[in-house]
């Protein structure tokens, strides 16, 4: 679309990559945090698909290369899921969180409080893609047999249930 073409033709993509790489250096954690920030910022004005296309084209190979240089192996599918999930998070995070503000309008609640509550409930959606980067077994990469896959699925389900219960104050 128009945004993707504008980012590519104006040279913004190369400048943005250079700025992010110079800030992060070889630090993978800072690079991941800056990629999250970029996803959330672009998500304020772009639909999810366009956000994914722009950020994936800008940052996916940077994350893979810096991860490899730092001793981490980030599968390309994990990086793409990471970018996609944080593109989805832009819909619930203030100040633009369109889904949160629409819910507040329907319920008659305060938009900012609804946005903050939406972030709290979506924490698992924010943690999961980071786990994808560092634990490839969640994507069934490197799983050797059926029992190993079953163990990964069961422990993942238990973990997400406990995490969700904690954010819902069931403990």
Regions of interest found by a model, annotated:
Residues 1-171:
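Alpha-helical transmembrane segments of multi-pass membrane transport proteins
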């Amino acid at each position: 679309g128009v945004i993707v073409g504008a980012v590519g033709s104006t040279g913004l993509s190369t400048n943005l990559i250079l700025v992010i790489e110079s800030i992060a250096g070889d630090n993978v954690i800072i690079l991941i945090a800056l990629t999250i920030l970029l996803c959330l910022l672009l998500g304020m004005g772009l639909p999810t698909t366009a956000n994914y296309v722009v950020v994936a084209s800008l940052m996916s190979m940077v994350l893979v290369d810096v991860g490899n240089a730092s001793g981490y192996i980030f599968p390309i599918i994990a990086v793409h899921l990471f970018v996609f999930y944080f593109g989805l998070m832009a819909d619930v995070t203030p100040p633009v969180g369109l889904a949160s503000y629409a819910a507040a309008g329907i319920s008659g609640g305060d938009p900012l409080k609804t946005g903050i509550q939406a972030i709290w409930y979506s924490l698992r959606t924010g943690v999961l893609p980071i786990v994808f980067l560092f634990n490839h077994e969640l994507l069934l990469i490197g799983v050797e047999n059926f029992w190993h896959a079953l163990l990964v699925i069961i422990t993942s389900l238990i973990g997400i249930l406990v995490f969700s219960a904690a954010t819902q104050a069931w403990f």
